[in-house]
Amino acid sequence: MSYTVKVEEARPATEKMPSAGPVYRSIYARDGLLELPEGLQSPWEFLSGSVKRSPKTPMLGRRQIKDSEAGPYVWLTYQEVHDEAIRMASAMRSRGVNPGDRCGIYGTNCPQWIVAMQACYSHAITYVPLYDTLGPNAVEFIINHGEVSIAFVQENKISAILSCLPNCSSLLKTIVSFGNITSVQKKETEALGVSCFSWEEFSQLGNLSGELPEKHRTDICTLMYTSGATGEPKGVILTNEAIMAEILSTDNMLELTDKVFSEEDVYFSYLPLAHVYDQIVENYCIYKGSAIGYWRGDIRFLMDDLQELKPTIFCGVPRVYDRIYAGIFHKVSSGGTLKKMLFQYAYNYKMANMEKGLPHGQAAPLMDKLFFDKIKQGFGGRIRLMFSGAAPLPHHVEEYLRVTSCAALSQGYGLTESCGGCLTSIANIFPMIGTVGVPMTTIEARLESVPEMGYDALSDKPRGEICLRGTTLFSGYHKREDLTKDVLVDGWFHTGDIGEWQPNGAMKIIDRKKNIFKLSQGEYVPVENIEGIYLQCPLIASIWVYGNSFESFLVAVVVPERLALENWAANRNLTDDFKSLCENPKASKYILDELNSTAKKHQLRGFEMLKAVYLEPNPFDMERDLITPTFKLKRPQLLKYYKDHVDKLYSEAKEARV
């Protein structure tokens, strides 16, 4: 059975454009893409609707900390969050912030983050997530580029904002702490002409009276900054329509294939709210009246928070699921021969039934009770639905968790530019394992051939760049019409990811077209920019950096500067020739340490550091098809040529970390 339908024929190649395959939709949208209900104009209506239905339902929860001990979760109701958002929006208006102005939100996941976002929704103010994982100067860049005039900031991020103020105080005029503010901080900001408030102080500036401004689908809901190919963040413009369509499409797909969220559900929030993935999930929770419980923001206590909250919905990235898989696998493997055999029998029995089409809950109830329920308890005991996104989930990990977690697991694919998920696997369709599924009900997808990489969208096994069209797409990059024109062509967004259609209509991610890739934790790596920094190390002549999207770190093939390496060897009384030196582990460690020293000097982030290198004595050349006539690296060919070395680097680096 195919889960997609063809709605447009393939496009042949022309002198200016490569060929493109047919256009497909999900079978659940065969009669047309999902349309927003008439009159729906803003995501604010999702919160106000839930308040009307169930004002006293718990909405946002966090653990109270007393004497360094975490207590139970304490909750704000839907009515309380609604009223606090109105007060905060009223206070913003009193400070001269008007509809269409920009409001920054800077901090880890917590109720105040969502209240600030909802305050923006209520008065048609554009919210701009601020976060520093895009680089050391990213917050300052986003404030200036996004023209942020007010910012809600977590207490422990106040100092970071203050360090930016000398270069952005002409724009940023108001800072509101998620909690308290010190007198010293107030004086420091006032000296620069900026007002600083505690959360309580600012709340008291607002009130619940007054009419809300008119809102429109075309309003810019958020400017969400994402990694740029050169390291400079790009501001992705997402409208109210895109956000709402994504949320309703999520509901649509869950209704058709599994079970929608409800007021009985509890979501565990720990993935960064500054990213589109978690924002969409939390917006969907609000639309359905579900509860959202926040972690403490400390990875050491994540499992403790999970056990206390006992959520029903869990979202993760491949790196998280890989760790969960490794933990389960280790426990089973160390449990003795008999226990291991019984577990494997239960696993095989349940998997066989799931392959026959039985949903996970009906595949092996007895085996669940005897073996797999203990794994479910690790998530708190109530998990019914898990999502994976941000990078491809390894096939073996997805299969293992589908069988053992006693929960439905759905893997999706999306980008900031597609407002989160644009393709999703159907949780109870076992053959979709290893794929990112079918288009959401707001999206059409096609593949475009990439001849230079050998990918043909018209072949028997269609492969090419994934292109998207639909209502959840972004409107462009803020102040970067040039970049917008590069990726939005004739209404089609060119993702830069290479996909392969499967016989059942699901999409599999197989490669990356652009010289920027994603690691397993979801971080983007602008590889050319990073290689340029590493090339400033005087010990190397050439470098090819590689990151497998199933791994969380980078490795590299390096051509050392011959004289520099030989001088290093002579100073240590090593008499090896150059080729032998390149095979010497001490030389590899020396080069690796010097490269990472260069990286630190230029403030590369932790995941941009190298964990292992292979020293290549021969320069990259055209004879081996490793470079172009203009000396540009041919990355697919480099990966093919050095694949065995790359696999060994990853294997050895992971062994060294254990």
Curated annotation (Swiss-Prot):
Annotated residues for binding of ATP: 226-234, 411-416, 497, 509-512, 632
Annotated stretches, region: SBD1: 298-411
Compartments in which it is found: Cytoplasm, Cytosol
GO CC term, one of those recorded: endoplasmic reticulum
A Pfam family reported for this protein in Swiss-Prot or TrEMBL: AMP-binding
Region spans: SBD2: 412-477
Family: Belongs to the ATP-dependent AMP-binding enzyme family.
Name of the molecule in the record: Probable CoA ligase CCL6
Organism of this sequence: Humulus lupulus (European hop)
Gene name per UniProt: CCL6
